Amino acid sequence: MATDWQPECLVAQNQPSLDPVGAHSDRALQNTTGNVQSYSDQLAHAGVTARDDQFHQYSFKYPHGPHPQPLSAPGLHQQHVAARLHQRKLRRLHSVGPNSQSRRAQSSYLKSQKYMEYRRRPRRDTGKDGEPVWSDELEDAFQQALEANPPMGRRKWSERGKSYGRNELIAEYIFKLTGKRRTRKQVSSHLQVLDSFLKGDPDWERLVREPALERSSSVHGSAPAPKWRTAVEHPSGSSHYGSHTHPSYHDHMRSMQPYAGDLPPPHYTLGSNMQETAASTIHGFSFDMWVSAPQQANRIDKALHAYTRLQGDLHHPVAPPMPLEHVNGWRSSFPQLASMVDDVNNPLDCDIILLEVNLELMTDFPPTGSRLGIQLDLDYGHPSAGDVLGVSQMDNWTCSTHIYQDSQKLLETYHDLPKTQSTKVKPLFESSWWAKLFTQLTQEKRIAEDSGNPQAARDADDHARQFFRSLSAVQEIRATSPSSCRLSNQYQGHHGDESKRMAVLAWKFRQTRPGEVGTTTWRRLIPAPDRTTTNSPRPASAVDRVPLSLDSILLNKPSHQGIYQAPHPHDLIHHPSQSQSQWPMYQSPHDNVSNLYNPSGHLDFMSSISKAEDGLNDKIAVTSVLDSFSASLAPESISSTSLHGSSGAPVMLNVHDLPLTHPGMGYTMGHETSHYVPSQHHSVNMHDSNSVLHGFFGSHTQPLDDLSHGHGSWGTHSTSIPGDVGAGSYHIPYQAEHHGPVSRESQQPHQFDGLLPSEDLMDKIVGRMSNGSGMHGAGPDAGYDNATVDAV
């Protein structure tokens, strides 16, 4: 029994979790510490059928770690100096090409059975530093060095007056990546060992042998430049590690292609505080589960049996990030994660890691006194900058674990983690529960095999495989920043609301097939962004519509807001209804003939023809001026039922509101705010003037002149404007209307005399015009109105 493994986390051996579990074996895993188990002969026998009903009872609470002492100012200074030295030491790591990692992750030989069997062998040879010559860290650096230094045969790479062979470049690369030296001979020996069982693999041949065509064409040429040295001489804008921080969020949003008429995609970030978001980024991950023999070091490289071990790089996942919605049945597999995603008050602002664990079970019980070890490490330190964001200063680390079977909760535990002094956090993964589970599964398998019935053995194996397929887990790691700790000191024992979610781990399990090695892969999951920050997806049957240009928007804005001309009676027809938005109905049938004359009484065809504006109710309100859409789509006007004046000025036209929404836009206009609604009707055409007119006046044809005589309702007069304009805000005095007769005195000859008809003919044309209301002020006695609106 190992009593020296994490002595501060020892748990009593007579706890309820160690009830009898089997009737066939005299050995079972016994919990001794947080993540280490030991085999013991002190467990009694019991039935196997009680296994499924016992798992939900096991919940362990570990004691609090020692209270952290506040760091002094010199201590903080030393940390900054250490981080600076660490950054200087690993500065050249940025020279790694961005494509080397992706190519290495796709190498087939890393997933081959022979390579995995070689890596799971115990490492017996140690270097001068007392560590295995090719540990997992060095093996990962070695694989990166193979990608960064292409094969060069017997040629050399010259730099600073010295020649380097490929093995020397690989050894130098490993030293700069890990800080551990391996000689040229050690690199050569390791290559020979790997080549003995990887020879013939296309990916391996590409890394160790130079193509024949390239070798024959460059016999007298120089060796190919190492990729990482070329990158140093010609630095690029992004590096391998520099572009690693949250690559999924930017790439995912960049892949969204907007279509015509759509809003631009927003800048998507996780969380409101950039520094806190970067602090919760996981830069390294490690997970192993193994059994150590008695009197043997409790390490994965000395393991008696490895249930699973991390596959690939410790600092980079093997698979690219994947949207959370692409995980089949993630809501039923991870109910706790689903509740976090649906919580709008506490959005996910940390990394979500998906771990797919393949477990290789033991065929028999291990020797008495063996121990189960589980190593789970999360590294928040940047590979080159270290702990510059102060993750090691965070306190009150907690870990909650939820284990499910077919969406039914089997186990729920909460643990307080000891304060970390580095950037690595070691969450607990319920090793006692796993020890009991492995013992019971092995017990069932032995009972089935000893029965002599092959079908019973197959049923036991199928039962175990089905159990692992239905098994899932969710872990949430939280911590409190130093600033939150200082604020929470005012309230004794109250810091739960101040904690920050640091990571969410989603676990899926399966049992390996015969002959396979247990491996674990990890990848980041991208939660669906909030609906308020992204555009609605484009429907499959959508039709692209040309967006309005800026010129059309500006042309619809009124040019003079201070001058108001009194409208004509035919333009101001009042409808006895409530206040609604005003829409321009039609253009004037003809312009005022009197405007053809300049003030001197001469005909002037070079000047523009001025026309009185439609009315006060057609003015654009302030809210629509602030909106980015054209006023012609959904104009807002002063909601006034009538315009009242003491001088007898005519009133304005009020019509019912038309719910016209542009089919290509998702906005509707109102007086209070603009609400986003999905477009539902695609049959409305804004340019269909007939449908708009029929909505007001019916489908029958009627002269517009008759409309002002028989279908208009006139209201009383007042000097106030109700609606959008508050009482007392504006006062509109009107000047008395007067008509200025048009003088037709003798005119001076000008350059258009040859083009115009004679004066007698013009007199006949003008004299025959009547002064009736049907002329709308265009008769010979008509004048022009001159009224202004002054804002008080």
Curated annotation (Swiss-Prot):
The gene is abaA. It comes from Penicillium roqueforti (strain FM164). Induction: Expression is positively regulated by pcz1. PROSITE patterns: TEA_1 (PS00554), TEA_2 (PS51088). Residues 114-131 have a biased composition (Basic and acidic residues). One of its GO terms (molecular function) is RNA polymerase II cis-regulatory region sequence-specific DNA binding. Belongs to the TEC1 family. Residues 83-94 have a biased composition (Basic residues). GO terms for cellular component: nucleus; transcription regulator complex. Residues 61-134, 213-272, 708-732, 767-792 are annotated as: Disordered. Pfam families: TEA. Residues 127-201 bind DNA. This is Conidiophore development regulator abaA. One of its GO terms (biological process) is conidium formation. Its main location: nucleus. BrlA, abaA and wetA are pivotal regulators of conidiophore development and conidium maturation. They act individually and together to regulate their own expression and that of numerous other sporulation-specific genes. Binds to the sequence 5'-CATTCY-3', where Y is a pyrimidine, making both major- and minor-groove contacts. Residues 97-111, 236-246 have a biased composition (Polar residues). It is found in: Nucleus. Keywords: Activator, Conidiation, Nucleus, Sporulation, Transcription, Transcription regulation.
